[in-house]
Amino acid sequence: LGHPEVYIVLLPALGIASEVIATNARKPIFGYRAMVGSILAIAFLSTIVWGHHMFVTGMNPFLGSVFTFTTLLIAIPSAVKAFNYITTLWKGNIQFNPPMLFAIAFVSTFITGGLTGIILGDSALDINVHDTYFVVAHFHLVMGISALYGMLAGMYHWYPIMFGRMMNKNLGYVHFWITAISAYGVFFPCLLYTSDAADEQLS
């Protein structure tokens, strides 16, 4: 159906980010019940948003409105998770070690991907940016980079527990900054380039 797999890849990263942020902020995750409810809502809603990939195929306008609604609806539990991550950081005793930096970067790309997803979820806007680099940037920020940050945060966080050896923290910082700058360096220009491409399509 073309969309649940995005969230299936993201769900472990969401859980890892919750663990890493709570541990390194030295406080429990804010709104635990809301976090559980929102992850269940995301898991369910991800199965009924696939039609937003088909807005430009001559879809029935009523059906397009339904898929616009469900796609925008999934932004609510996603926003709850992002808000709770940020609120957990608020006034926390934060340790900015490599796993925490990757977890914060995950939240950053999750928010960026979510905001671009709202644009793509609206059928009127999606028609204008369909087949542009905007979609490429959105997809890779959400599916690729966010999942990668979650995996790396978990790797740096649990490696010492699993293997009884510490990883080199300085190399971890170098790894983080190269990855973060490269990821946004590749995909942020795609978002900017799209505005020119969309203008050319409209004119």
What role is predicted for each listed range?
Residues 7-15, 72-84, 144-154:
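Hydrophobic cores of alpha-helical transmembrane segments in multi-pass inner/ER membrane proteins
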Residues 29-44, 87-117, 133-136, 141-150, ...:
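Interfacial and helix-entry/exit segments of alpha-helical transmembrane bundles
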Residues 1-5, 67, 71, 130-143:
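Short aromatic-rich membrane-water interface segments that cap or initiate transmembrane helices
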Residues 1, 90, 111-132, 195:
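Juxtamembrane/interfacial segments at transmembrane-helix boundaries in multi-pass membrane proteins
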Residues 1-51, 80, 105:
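Short helix-boundary/re-entrant hairpin motifs in multi-pass inner-membrane proteins
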Residues 54-61:
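Membrane-interface helix caps and helix-loop-helix hairpins in membrane proteins
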Residues 193-202:
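Single conserved hydrophobic/aromatic residue that forms the stacking wall/gate
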Residues 61-94, 98-105:
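Long, K/E/R/D-enriched contiguous segments that form extended
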